[in-house]
Swiss-Prot record:
Cofactor binding note of this UniProt entry: Binds 1 iron-sulfur cluster per subunit.
Binding site for iron-sulfur cluster: C42, C106, C108
Gene3D superfamilies: HesB-like domain (2.60.300.12)
This protein's record includes keyword Transferase: no
Protein name, entry field: Iron-sulfur cluster insertion protein ErpA
Keyword Iron-sulfur found: yes
Amino acid sequence: MSDDVALPLQFTDAAANKVKSLIADEDNPNLKLRVYITGGGCSGFQYGFTFDDQINDGDMTIEKQGVSLVVDPMSLQYLVGGAVDYTEGLEGSRFVVNNPNATSTCGCGSSFSI
């Protein structure tokens, strides 16, 4: 998908830059950042991030700056309207999801409820 199409999930420049850097470190240009939702965490659902070299049937792919973000259909329904970002701060550096669908989140921001 191109940058000028309205997307159900945003992939920020900061996240794309970090993915590009990590892929270069791994020396595997086929890697993509996969974001997914699983049950668990202190709020009911939790975000997960992993590098994957596969795109499965039904996955949505967002390309930015030559790298890809991949989301499975089940996870996408909980992420619509959100943004995958990368932050650096006192608590460390990490990928985060800014999710307008979450009615509450835990203190660390890695789990949420709807």
